[in-house]
């Protein structure tokens, strides 16, 4: 790779490093796997940087590569995966002022949310993570996944229904216990 292209790529890594890590973390659910997938994504992007033609935004191109890296890691490790971290530390479900009981419930709810995501197929999970966790709009998420917007909407609907059912079962059980 020529010097100018290397400098340009270094700028991309600097600008999008956290972004790629956060995406892989949301898909994989733990720091070590997310770091490995993010490194794999940037290695793949580096190898293919000269073929990037600028037909899409750099962020979209990196999303696709990062999603692929995370999904490859997920498939490779599927049999030995365990839930080591919820991946939703920044999700504030209750106020810390609510007390230790509410904080424990918050942590438990996060765990069940991650379990619900983990039970989804890769296609459904990725659609939900891109749209509902990463905050992409429908067009951006569809472009990253290389599917139509209507296909994305169908995946989102199925994924959300399954997540809702999973969380509803937990909430019903929790209500019976209290």
Which residue stretches match the model-derived regions?
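Structural recognition of an alpha-helix C-terminal capping motif at a helix-to-coil junction
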Residues: 22, 36-43, 56-68
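Helix-turn-helix DNA-binding module
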Residues: 118-126, 130-151, 165
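A short, charge-rich alpha-helical start-of-domain segment used by transcription regulators
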Residues: 2-22, 46
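Internal acidic/polar
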Residues: 80-103, 137
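Short amphipathic alpha-helical boundary/capping segments
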Residues: 9-11, 112-120
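Sigma70-family region 2
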Residues: 2-3, 42-57, 76-77
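DNA-recognition helix of helix-turn-helix
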Residues: 67, 71, 145-168
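Arg/Lys-rich amphipathic alpha helix in sigma70-family domain 2
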Residues: 64-85, 106, 169
């Amino acid at each position: 790779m020529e010097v100018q292209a290397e400098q340009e790529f270094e700028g991309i890594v600097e600008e999008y490093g956290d972004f790629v890590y956060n995406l892989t973390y949301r898909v994989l659910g733990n720091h070590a796997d997310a770091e490995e997938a993010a490194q794999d994504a940037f290695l793949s992007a580096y190898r293919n940087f000269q073929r990037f033609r600028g037909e899409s935004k750099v962020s979209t191109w990196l999303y696709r590569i990062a999603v692929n890296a995370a999904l490859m890691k997920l498939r490779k490790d599927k049999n030995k995966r365990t839930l080591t971290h919820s991946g939703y530390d920044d999700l504030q479900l209750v106020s810390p002022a609510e007390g230790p009981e509410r904080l424990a419930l918050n942590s438990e709810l996060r765990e069940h949310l991650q379990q619900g995501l983990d039970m989804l197929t890769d296609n459904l999970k990725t659609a939900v993570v891109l749209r509902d966790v990463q905050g992409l709009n429908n067009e951006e998420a569809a472009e990253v996944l290389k599917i139509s917007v209507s296909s994305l909407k169908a995946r989102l609907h199925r994924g959300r229904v399954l997540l809702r059912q999973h969380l509803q079962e937990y909430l019903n059980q929790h209500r019976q216990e209290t």
